[in-house]
Amino acid sequence: SLNTTVSFPNSPAFNASTERWTIADPPTYIAAIRPGTEEDIGKVINLARTKRFPFLTRGAGHGYSASLGAFQHGLSLDLSQWKTLKIDKKAQTLTVGPGVTFAEIFDPLFKAGFYIQTGSCSCPSMIGVTIGGGIGRLMGKYGLLMDALQSVRMVGAGGKVMRVSATSHPDLWWGILGAGANFGVITSATYKVHPLVNNGNVFIADFYLPVERSREYFDIVEANYSNMSANLAQIMVASWNRTTSSVQLGGNWVYYGPEKEARKELAPVFNLNATSSTRIVRWSEIISSAGFDEFICQPNQPRSLFSLNQKIYSADGYQAGFEKIEKYFYDHPGGRDTTLVFENFPNQAVAAIPDASTAFPWRDFKGFIQINFAWTAGDDATAQASNKLGKELRNQFATTSGYSEKAIFVNYAHGDESIENIYGRRKLPRLAQLKKKYDPSNLFAYNHPLP
């Protein structure tokens, strides 16, 4: 179509169509195409299948799996300009295109009187996050982001446009809900949204503790919040404080309800008498008010992530990991933009959905551990130390995660894990059958690929 454009290396258009959040383990491209229509996407897919050249779909450029490094000298299928956003107030639905990021839904949805469960930073593609599951602070109330999904339009490996839902291609729908990157190019997605509660206001409390009080804080979390309210969520971050030249622990709590209820829920934390701040913000401002989104969302940075699901909160495990990251900060000053993140999220609504109903394998988790390594481009020594420590910490945290083997959320996976650890042993046979049926040529083979 006239709206489809092709670009080549060393041009501004090409750079825009291949920009990534992380420059670690990069895929490489010989050309980029911005398709103007679903039909043109189908033509690209058909050419890729018949001519046997690789392509990689791009929404917001936030994919960071090391497995993407296996993609070399291919085509970027850039959908970042597909920014359709439609709210149907009567049906209480939101429809978005693959280029729409979380940042772009907050204000329109809030102004329309709705909200939805989202991720914890603003820059990824909403659809990209969804098809791996989509976790976040509201999953105790409303489930995973994919649990809000009602239907998608997708160009499949055969080049044809399909509407996929619980009643249209239900077998493929099952696979999209947890392993969606393996089956086609999603061009739009429709979600169920919820009317705002508490006038759309949420209570936020931030706590900051010096290194010597880390264990005390971890004990409070394990003892009081292992079965937290569905309205409550916390993200803990261990980071280097450049002002004090030491490690600090921060806890960002969000409560979806009145301040009085929030303060009652958080009484054990307030009783620590730690440095703290509180505020009431609109739902649409939660991420921007947390203070780390702008830094996290900077593109074109060397980053490497290692992660693990947690079924239990272990103060012993948290403290052991905290001490290792503290040593890393002192031994490797070039890595002091690194963060160790513990996401403590309730899972009532996630666990209420039958495990067999979707491909997603981890409905029993209550949170996630992430080590987000960051260093300066060219600092190979810090990069190597980060990779080594990331694997060590992942193995160490696995012993106190509550799982019998490593369980890793696909959107957080590093890319070196076994597919059993990512997709779950019991889900893989059915996923493998779906892959053979819907993508027999294995065109979608780079982002945590199925066998």
Curated annotation (Swiss-Prot):
Coiled coil: none annotated. PROSITE patterns: FAD_PCMH. It comes from the Eukaryota. Pathway: Secondary metabolite biosynthesis. The keyword Flavoprotein applies. Pfam families: BBE (PF08031), FAD_binding_4 (PF01565). Its EC number is 1.-.-.-. The keyword DNA repair does not apply. Residues 22-196 form the FAD-binding PCMH-type domain. Gene3D superfamilies: 3.30.465.10, 3.40.462.20. It is an enzyme of class 1 (oxidoreductase). Keywords: FAD, Flavoprotein, Oxidoreductase. GO terms for molecular function: FAD binding; oxidoreductase activity. InterPro entries: BBE (IPR012951), FAD-bd_PCMH (IPR016166), FAD-bd_PCMH-like_sf (IPR036318), FAD-bd_PCMH_sub2 (IPR016169), FAD-linked_Oxidoreductase (IPR050416), Oxid_FAD_bind_N (IPR006094). Its cofactor is FAD. FAD-linked oxidoreductase; part of the gene cluster that mediates the biosynthesis of virensols and trichoxide, fungal natural products that contain or are derived from a salicylaldehyde core. The pathway begins with the synthesis of the reduced chain in virensol C by the highly reducing polyketide synthase virA via condensation of one acetate and 8 malonate units. VirA has interesting programming rules since the first 2 ketides are fully reduced, the 3 following ketides undergo beta-dehydration, and the last 3 ketides are only reduced to beta-hydroxys to yield the trihydroxy portion. Belongs to the oxygen-dependent FAD-linked oxidoreductase family. This is FAD-linked oxidoreductase virF. The gene is virF.
